[in-house]
Regions:
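UBL (ubiquitin/ubiquitin-like) substrate-recognition surfaces
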Residues: 1-438
Length: 438
């Protein structure tokens, strides 16, 4: 999520970005590669005070070294474009602490304005950000007072664009899903023409388009009027490694996504069953004790079957002639892998047939409703004006030099802490849900 990353904060603010879980649909990389950037005018390299060009240069420099270096050109461009980030610390030493989400939003807004497509096959006004990172809400605004409804005031329908989803944190929110649901309803005070005065309205939002990359902002910093400062909400809010966004979608979009999402889950289960069966055959082949994958029931009958299977496998392993044996031919790993590959290809074909033409026409939208967590930005500290930001990015599998495809991921993450980069286990990500240091 790291932009590809999910930002959750160090007991503080968290924000995050999920990448569409589409490994069962896309045969290639689901990310945007160099050719995609060139299509939006990010081809060359050269020192520049322009924020967009400086970011391009920064990405290129980072790709050419594993050593740490200060991104001064980019920082100078950011401070020039947005003077708030050039604010000095109150003690006069260095720059003031800034909010990561504010910096992210300003950078994305700038990129959205500057990165216009120069590809003849795309709309001239289309932005890279709009294409890959923007979603759409269908909204309904309705007055809370019955008197307005009785007077004939109708709900107002509209459409909004979003570049991130907000996870609102209240005393009732314990999980990301609950925080996102809270953000889908908003109370607004506005004038009612029917009542002739201000009244409270409820604005309900439902997602009509899911982007390929989805940032999620955990709203852990809240403005306190009594102290005139931002306070950090330390409440623990857990989050999944796979986000199912279907429940937040409009009814029309749900109808398109649910068949695809359910098919993906079915394919995963089949793959898991095949892998379990392969391991079980290996254990039997080597004469190891083995339990049936799914016992038919409890009681003497099942126990007898278990004992018989165990006894038979032991006799086969020892070559005993006490019982009549049939020759058993075991499949090789190559045969099993070939069958598995054929099964996956067939399942992918069936899956593609389930994807609606409307979704297929939009090559940069999410077609499954599922997102995989790829990165997390965290904040350590109790206040917004101090602390320390670090980030976690999920490791990609190594590229096979022969096929060019990436190998299976090992589930580990890179932890970026200033110029120090270290590898951490998946369990470390579970500690970033707040309620403590993070």
């Amino acid at each position: 999520m790291s932009w590809l990353s999910t930002s959750l904060g160090k007991t503080s603010e968290r924000a995050g970005c999920h990448r569409e879980r589409a490994d069962a649909i896309n045969s290639g990389s689901s990310g945007a590669g160099p050719s995609d950037f060139r299509a939006f005018g990010l081809g060359g390299l050269g020192a520049s005070s322009d924020l967009t060009e400086s970011l391009r240069d920064l990405f290129k420099q980072m790709s050419e070294t594993q050593e740490g270096f200060p991104p001064m050109m980019f920082l100078n461009a950011l401070r020039t474009a947005f003077p708030q980030f050039a604010q000095k610390a109150k003690d006069g030493h260095g720059y003031a602490q800034q909010d990561a989400e504010e910096a992210w939003s300003q950078i994305v807004t700038q990129l959205r304005q500057k990165l216009k497509s120069n590809d003849a096959s795309q709309e001239a006004s289309e932005s890279f950000i709009d294409k890959y990172m923007s979603g759409k809400f269908e909204t309904v605004m309705e007055c809370d007072e019955q008197a307005a409804k009785d007077g004939g005031e109708q709900p107002v329908k509209g459409e909004d664009t979003f570049l991130k989803l907000n996870c609102h944190i209240t005393a009732e929110v314990n999980h990301l899903r609950e925080g996102l649901a809270a953000g889908m309803q908003e109370k607004i005070e506005k004038n009612s023409e029917v009542l002739g005065r201000n009244s409270m309205y409820t604005k309900t939002s439902r997602i009509a388009r899911l982007p390929k990359y989805l940032p999620v902002h955990f709203m852990r910093f809240d403005w306190r009027k009594d102290t005139s400062k931002k306070a950090k909400i330390m409440r623990k809010v857990t989050f999944p490694h796979e986000l199912d966004a279907v429940e937040f979608c409009s009814e029309d979009l749900k109808k398109l996504l649910i068949p695809v999402r359910d098919k993906i889950r079915e394919i995963r289960k089949e793959e898991e069953d095949v892998e379990r069966a392969r391991k079980r055959r290996k254990r039997i082949q080597h004469g190891e004790d083995v339990e049936p994958a799914e016992p038919k029931g409890k009681g003497p009958a099942s126990e007898t079957e278990l004992a018989k299977e165990k006894k038979d496998s032991q006799k086969k392993a020892s070559g005993s002639t006490d019982v009549e044996m049939e020759d058993v031919e075991y499949k090789t790993d190559a045969q099993i892998e070939a069958e598995r590959t054929a099964s996956i290809l067939k399942a992918k074909k069936e899956l593609l047939e389930l994807v609606d033409g409307e979704l297929l026409a939009d090559d940069s939208c999410n077609k499954t409703g599922l997102y995989e967590l790829r990165g997390v930005i965290t904040h350590q500290g109790a206040t917004a004006d101090s602390g320390h930001y670090t980030s976690f990015v999920k490791k990609e599998g190594q590229k096979d030099p022969v096929t060019g495809k990436r190998k299976e991921e090992d589930g580990k993450w890179w932890w970026f802490n200033d110029d120090k980069v270290s590898e951490v286990d998946n369990d470390r990500i579970e500690t970033l849900s707040g309620g403590g240091k993070y």
